């Protein structure tokens, strides 16, 4: 498994990278995990979500915020600097339990990463993602093509969650967004510290990892 840190990248560019790598992985290349942050973007999933957007596309454009229809599962969500995004391009068919188990394992990566920093997080039956009580700290939405996964999870790390004010989070009116900073304040880890722990948890839960030559990697 290659683990590649893409840094700060636009959504469309990361989507194109995933799709290209998916074709290679489906043909037998090594599985790849991309870790990154996105420039501000609001995405709509396969379940829709346009009705949960509180502002217009034109206004978003004036603020430099993209609005994108995504191929991932789920409803509306947003991405921004200060949020750790993980995109595993993995072969689903070879994994016991298939996509359902993979989804569970992604949640486990997040739960164990948060536990490392002293936060008790959990699954919520019927509500995908990872929660701290009624506060959502991580959204998960995946897609599968040629029995290979892409898209993944978005874990809120930093202070600024203002983009969530523009949407009804995942179409759930009672859902609140939180982050490691919101929960831990001055004791919150840096983005790099969260990336490092997240990478270790992926290795522990999914597989041993190797580093792609010539790429920034963890």
UniProtKB/Swiss-Prot annotation:
Q: Where is this site: Lowers pKa of active site Cys?
A: 136
Q: Which residues form the signal peptide?
A: none
Annotated catalysed reactions:
octanoyl-[ACP] + L-lysyl-[protein] = N(6)-octanoyl-L-lysyl-[protein] + holo-[ACP] + H(+)
Q: What is this enzyme's EC?
A: 2.3.1.181
Where in the chain are disulfide-linked cysteines found?
Answer: none
Q: In which pathway does it act?
A: Protein modification; protein lipoylation via endogenous pathway; protein N(6)-(lipoyl)lysine from octanoyl-[acyl-carrier-protein]: step 1/2
Localization per record: Cytoplasm
A GO molecular function for this record?
A: lipoyl(octanoyl) transferase activity
Q: Which GO terms describe its biological process?
A: protein modification process
Where does the chain bind substrate? 72-79, 139-141, 152-154
The segment(s) forming the BPL/LPL catalytic domain are 27-210
Entries under CDD domains matching the protein: LipB
Q: Does the keyword Cytoplasm apply?
A: yes
Q: Which GO terms describe its cellular component?
A: cytoplasm
What positions does UniProt annotate as the active site of this protein?
Answer: 170
Q: Identify the domain of life.
A: Bacteria
**Remaining remarks:** In the reaction, the free carboxyl group of octanoic acid is attached via an amide linkage to the epsilon-amino group of a specific lysine residue of lipoyl domains of lipoate-dependent enzymes.
Family under the similarity heading: Belongs to the LipB family.
Protein name (Swiss-Prot/TrEMBL) = Octanoyltransferase
């Amino acid at each position: 498994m290659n683990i590649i840190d893409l840094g700060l990248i636009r959504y469309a560019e990361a989507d194109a990278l995933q799709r290209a790598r998916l074709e290679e992985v489906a043909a037998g290349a090594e599985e790849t995990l991309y870790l990154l942050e996105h420039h501000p973007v609001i995405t709509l999933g396969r379940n829709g979500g346009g009705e949960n957007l509180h502002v217009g596309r034109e206004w978003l454009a004036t603020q430099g915020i993209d609005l994108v229809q995504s191929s991932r599962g789920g409803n509306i969500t947003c991405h921004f600097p200060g949020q750790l995004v993980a995109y595993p391009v993995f072969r689903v068919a070879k994994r016991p339990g298939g996509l359902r188990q993979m989804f569970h394992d992604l949640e486990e990566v997040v739960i164990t990463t948060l536990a490392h920093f002293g936060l008790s997080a959990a699954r919520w039956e019927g509500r995908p993602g990872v929660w701290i009580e009624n506060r959502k700290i991580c959204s998960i939405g995946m897609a599968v093509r040629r029995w290979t996964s892409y898209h993944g999870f978005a874990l809120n790390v930093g202070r600024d969650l203002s983009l969530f004010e523009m949407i009804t989070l995942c179409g759930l009116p009672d859902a609140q967004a939180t982050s490691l900073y919101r929960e831990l304040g001055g004791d919150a880890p840096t983005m790099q510290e969260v990336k490092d722990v997240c990478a270790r948890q992926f290795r522990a839960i999914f597989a041993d990892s190797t580093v792609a030559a010539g790429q920034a990697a963890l």
